[in-house]
Every structure is written in C-alpha cells, then in structure tokens.
Amino acid sequence: MPKFHVRGAKNHSTGYLVCLISILAGLFSGPMAWSQAGASSIEEVLVTAQRRSESVQDVPIAITVQTAEDLRKNNIIDIRDIGNVVPGLLYAGQSSIGVPAIRGIQSWLGSGGTEQPTAMYVDGVYQPNMWVNLMDLADIEQIDVLKGPQGTLFGRNSMGGAIVITTAKPEYETRGKVSVKYGVYTGSDQDAGDKSIAAFATGPLIEDVLAYSLSIYTRDMDGYLTNDRDGSRSGKHEKYTARAKLLWEPSNNTSILLSLVKSEADDFETLATQTLNDNSINAYYDDGRWSSEPWHVSSNLTGGTNPHFHESESFSLKISHYFDGFGTLTSSTSFSEYEDEFTIDLDTGTSPTCNAPFPCIDFWQGYPSEDIQQEFLFTSDQFGKVSFIAGVYYYENDAGYIGNVAPVLNLNSGGHSDGKESKIGFISGSTTYIESQAIFASIDYQISDQLTLSLGGRYNDEEIYAEGLAYLGLKGVCSPNIDCSPVKHTSFDPRLALNYEYSDALSFYISYTEGSKGAVMSTFTLTPNDFAGPEDLSSIEVGMKATGDNYRMSAAIFSYDYEDFQDQVWNGTYAILSNVKEAEMQGIELDLLYNFSENLQIRAVASYLDSEYGDHLTAVPNGVMSQQPMPLAVVNVKGDQMRIAPELSYGLTLTHTSFLPTGELEVSASMSYSDDVWFEYLQRVKQDAWTVVNASVSYAPSNSDIRLSLFGRNLGNKKYFTSALLDPTNDSPVYSPPRQVGIALDYAF
C-alpha cells in the first residue's frame, strides 16, 4: 500500500477530509443497507475507458462520469467548468486559457509543439491543440474523466489521465433540441450580456441504412472587463461551432461514420491580465501599469484587449466491421487543421502615445498546426475466460509558430501598432514536427468468477524536431544557437490490474501502471537546447466501487513516482521548458451519487493530494520576486508543494425535484472548494483557497417539450485567478468570470 504523509497541511483542510471520510465510511459500512423504499433508482452508466463499452462498475480505473443531465443540472457550458464537479481535476496553469491538471499533473504549454499531459478525445479522436479546452458543451452526451496514466490504450500524452468526450450520434428516429440562453455578468463594473443558441437534429435519410445528425452552436458575449485606458468595455467573445455526422450501415455487421467539425472564434479575448508586482516593463510609464483590480485591464490596442482569432476544421472517418463469433475491427482516420492568432499589448500604456519616446510594444503571435491520425483497433469477443484488445496507431503533427514584436521605435501615429501588419520589428518563426507510431494490446483473463486479471502494454516510437527559427523575416534557416537535430524517444508502458467482484454491488481493484511522454521542444524562447527530455511516471492505485438501487460510489488511493517532470524552469533570466528531476504524489479521491428519495439527489466529490518536488537545483530569475524575494542565485525546490496541485478540493451538488400537477419543478445548487494553488515551482505566485457557488431553478410543464430555467454562476462573485502568465519581470494572472445570472429555454422535439 502506498505510504502517505502530510507536510504542513492546513488544520481545517485535514479536518474536512477526515470528517468526509468518516461520514462515507459509516454510510458504506453496510452498502446494501442503503436501499430505501421510495428512493429512485440510478441508471447504469456505460463507459469506453478500456476501448469497449462496459459498465463503469466493472472497470478497474478511477473514472468520473458527467452525463448530459449532469451537465445541465450544474449549468456547465464550458469544458473547463467540469473541474468544479470532478475530484482531482483543476483547469488552471500558465496558459491564458487554462488547461487540465489531473492529480497535479500538468506541463507548461508555452508554444507550438507543446502538448498537455492529459489526453483529450472527442468522439474517439485525439485533440492535440490546447484550444480544445475552450470547447462549448452544446451537443455532449457524456464526458468520462479517466484518472491515472492511460498510455496503454489511449497512447501519447496521457500521463495524468484522459478526458473522453462523446457527442450526440446519428439516429434513425427523428428528434432534435433547441436551447437558447441569455445571461448577464453583474459582478464587474461592466454589465455584460452573454447570448448563445444551440440546435441539434437527427433522423433517417434511408430507413435503417443511412442517418444524419447536425449540431450548431453560436455564442456572443459582451466583455465584462474594463479597459482603464479609456473606460471602454473589453473581453468579448464571438464564436460558433458546427458539427455534421453521417452514419451508413450497409449491413448488420458494418457501420461507417463520417464526421465534419468547423469552429471559429472572432475577436475572442482570452487574456485578461493584471501584474502582480511593480518590477515590470510597465514601470517605465507612470500611467502604464496594469490595474491590480480584478476584471480591469489597460491596453492601447485597438479592437480590444489582446484580441484573439481561432479557426479549426476537422474530418474523421470510422469504419467498423464485426466478424461473427470473433470480434470487431475498427479503422479510425482523422485530419485536423488549426489556426490561432492573437496580439498582446506588452507596454499596456494608458497614454495614447505610450509616453514617447518610449515605444508602443505589441506582440502578435500565430500558431498554425495540422495533424493526421490513423488507428486500427481489434476488439475481441469473449473466448471462454479470455478477451483482448489490440491495435496499431500512427500520428503526425506539424505545429508552427510565428511571433512579431513591433515597432522597435515609436513610429506609429496615435501610439498604436499591429504586430501582424508591421514591417518593422523583431520576427521569429519555427515549425515543430512530431511523428509517432505505436502498437498496443490488452488482455483480460478471468481467473475465477469473481477475479479478473488485466495485462497490457504499449510500445511507442516517436521523433520530434524543430526548424526554421528566423530573425527579421529570414525563414527556413535553423538558428545557430538551436540544436535542430531530431530527438527520438522509444518507450514501453505496461499496465497490470486485478479486479475482484465481491458481489454485483461491490468490487475492488488494484493496478500498477507506467506512463511516458516524449521530448517536447519549445519554439518560443530561442535558446540553445530549448527542449524538455522525456518524462516517466509509475503509479500504484487501489480502489473500490459500489452500486445499488439508489446509489453509486467510488473511492481510490494512489501513489505516483514522477521522473524528469516537464515544466517551466528559470535559467536566471527567463523561463525555458526543461525537466524537474523528480516528484512524488499520493492522494485519495471519493465520488458519491445518492438518491435520498424520488425527489432529492446528492452528488459529493472530494480529493486530497499530497505532492512534493524532489531534489532539484534551479536558477532564480533576476530582479525582485513577486511575493517571495530570494536573493540567492540558486535554490533547491525539494519538499515544496507542486504547482496546480491543491491539497484539498471538494464539491457538493443537491438537486430537488417536485412533481406538481402542472409540471416538474427542479432546484439545483452546487458548491466547489479548492485549497491554495501555486502557479510555478518557485512558489512566487499563489491563489488562496476559494469557494464557488452555482444554482439553477427549472420548470417543465406537463405534456410539453419545453423547459424554462433560471441560473446563477459564481453567485458569491468570488475573485480568483485560474491562470498566471509568468515572467521574471511581469507576472500576470487571468481571473475567472464574475457573477452571472441568466435564463434558458430548452425545446425538444
């Protein structure tokens, strides 16, 4: 069993955890005694965590499932919101958009070619681009969050786990849904409207042979930020997504599914930052410091504060054929293309002329990328006591980067510059290439009626290189200070698990898993050997799952040993992507769904994480530190709490449904809590503990296809930041949205 220790844990946090464990232990001391007369039953949940459809009860993996109904009750409209209802998951970090950290595992995402260590899948297709974290949940059927290394079956970059998103499928029954929402952000100085429309339709084109589905989502949000330069509104969102699917089933054994997705965000402002210190580039200007007040910014850019453009297109083709008495062979092919552009106001001056002769300094960045994926997967039938899965996988990704800082002199009238259009300034550009192949297999053997052994492994062969770093527009030439030779990496990720089914309602499992992640090149900082070498993780996990007529519960205890953790480190002047030698993590997670009656349901989740860096010396950035001055040139981070790894986090959702003569009235309230979070490993930038409260009231008239809802998000108007863009001279947080209240109308047909 993993050994647990608590370093400097807060008394209240430990007390909360002990209290929660005690309560749940008491409740489950006799699981079958939970069944109550009059309590509504809980439906079985199917997942594909082991690449075949199975009951979540039978899978020896820690999984949290959010169904479409769960998302509606919690008013979750953004993929990042699921961190409030999934134990051990937090959307935060050093990216302006926030990226998932599962059990404290997250890498720095600084530029093209850097991929998050939590694998994101949409309809079975891996999503390498980090902008998928801005995905709106318009046509989602289910989200499965798999925790712990998932490399054996899900492949590359699943060190922390995998988030598997399933969207609505084509059906042979004509049906659809339209949802209209309007909300107002009332917690900032700018009352901002937020309008969205989602529509979904499916039905047959040829009965029992050909079916379609189509979903469209559009959102238009006024900015809730105040630009201190002129008092104007900033931070608007304008985006849409269209998804089309075509299902052809020429026979009972064969199915072909074609999917097309188009997404675009215009003037989508992802950066809403304020400096945390006075030792910044902005100190050159008396009126040029970013505001310290949340939801206030300062920018002399036209078109908003840090305007951003995102466009993506993807295509996927899945062909499945069932061989009678043997199994199913599936071919999955996909192609995706992304284009991301945004401008950062580096000087942030409030003066129209940037206090000449100092320049207006704006930084335009572009991240074009495309990827190709091909997988062949065979899923066997049950042969006596044995079943197995085997497959091969190919992945190719080209991730570009171009940056333009302009102008170097204050040549533009009015003090405004557009880095994209400027002909004067510092220009850099590069492309990172990744090519990966893998072969994998997993076998399940029933040792007895109650005990099942799972054994699997994945062999990975990967190559990554970068080229084309350029100065003053000289492209296609590898910079002399960069080693552009390919970095090759091979690994084998094994998995061993035992699942003991004590009864239909109670099971236990233990697993040992190893995960790996290949080298990562950063194309941003322009330094020699600017890449992080491969990282490795070994995990031991012990868990239990219990189900009954009116409850579902899971608990897991885990211990991680992390080697060569890829992270942002300091070289004494600026940040680079490198490796922290080692880290350790231990924790416990709980997930409980319980129906007290036909009218009342409770969902409680909790996670406790003890994490620390191992022995690692690192340089300290020059200049005054944001919160913790360190005059030393070199420090050892050994024993420090890892970043994006709160010790305690928990959430509670209560849903009460009243069945009235005229219809159904549903009231739902939820709260989520997170302990302190550090945003980089020198522990300079921290967000103190915070609690967020959401609520909704909905009414569905009898004999009607309409549901009307009132909702409130962040009702306490909690001011906390979820991301921090770090620099030795300018640490800038990105705050969460303020309080929002609104109304929604759903119509199903």
Predicted regions located by residue number:
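Outer-membrane beta-barrel domain signature, strongest for Gram-negative TonB-dependent receptors
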Residues: 231, 237-388, 395-397, 552-554
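Conserved C-terminal beta-signal and adjacent last beta-strands/turns
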Residues: 202, 369-391, 538-540, 640-749
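Outer-membrane beta-barrel translocator/receptor signature
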Residues: 116-117, 129, 138-141, 152-227, ...
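Structural signature of Gram-negative outer-membrane beta-barrels, strongest in the C-terminal barrel
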Residues: 247-251, 378-381, 385-387, 393-395, ...
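Acidic, small-polar-rich N-terminal luminal/periplasmic segments of exported/outer-membrane proteins
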Residues: 40-173, 187, 542
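Membrane-embedded beta-barrel scaffold of Gram-negative outer-membrane proteins
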Residues: 198, 316-346, 501-517, 533-601, ...
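Surface-exposed extracellular loop regions of Gram-negative outer-membrane beta-barrel proteins
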Residues: 266-277, 396-400, 486, 499-541, ...
